[in-house]
Amino acid sequence: CIRDRKYAFRKYKIKSVENNHTHLSPEELGKIESLELGGRFTKLEKTKDAFLFCCYAGLRYSDFTNLSPENIVKMHQETWLIYKSVKTNTEVRLPLYLLFEGKGIEVLNKYQDDLADFFKLRDNSNVNKELLIIAKLSGLNKRISFHTARHTNATLLIYSGVNITTVQ
C-alpha cells in the first residue's frame, strides 16, 4: 500500500466526540445549595453536600473519597485542606477559609461528628446517578456529574478574578 501510494484507511472516518465539560453558573449552584431534600430524597443529602464541598474546593471524586479528618488542618485559627492528589501524587494546600466565603467549612461543620463517614461515598457511577436526580429536583435542565463540581470551581474562581494559572 505504501509503495503504491495508496492509503489503506481512506474509507475510515475518525469520529470526534463532543467535549461535554459542564459547569454550573452561580445561579444554578444556588439552586442546589437551597434544595431541601426531605422524605424519600433524604438519602441524597450527603451526595449533595459532597458535591457542593467539591464545588467550593475543586476536588476530584478520587481525591474527595480519599480524604480523612486528618486532611482538615487548623493553622493560625484558619481551616485548610491539605491532601495528596490521587492523580498527580502532589500535595495540595487549600485555604478553605478564603474560598467562597468559607462555604466549604460550613459543609464540613455539618458532618463534624463523623467526617470520616462524610468522605465515604458510593461508587462514582451511582453518585453521578444521584446527582442527576438532585439536578432535576433543583430545577436544572443539565446533565451534571461529580466532575462538574471541579469545572464549576474553576469557572467561578476565574469569574471572580483569580488568575487562570493559579486555578490550573
Show which residues each predicted segment covers.
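Short aromatic-glycine-enriched beta-strand elements
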Residues: 79-81
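Generic hydrophobic alpha-helical scaffold/packing signal
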Residues: 33, 51-54, 65, 132-135, ...
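C-terminal catalytic core of Y-nucleophile DNA break-rejoin enzymes
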Residues: 18-19, 86-133
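Short, cationic motifs built from Arg/Lys/His that form the positively charged side of catalytic pockets
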Residues: 59-60, 92, 150
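Basic, Lys/Arg- and aromatic-enriched nucleic-acid-binding interface segment
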Residues: 6-61
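Short, basic (Lys/Arg/His-rich) helix/loop patches that form interaction surfaces
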Residues: 38-41, 112-117, 121, 129-166
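Short, charged phosphate-coordinating catalytic segments
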Residues: 3-5, 28, 54-77, 165
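Exposed loop/turn and edge beta-strand positions of beta-sandwich/beta-sheet ligand-binding modules
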Residues: 47, 77, 90, 140, ...
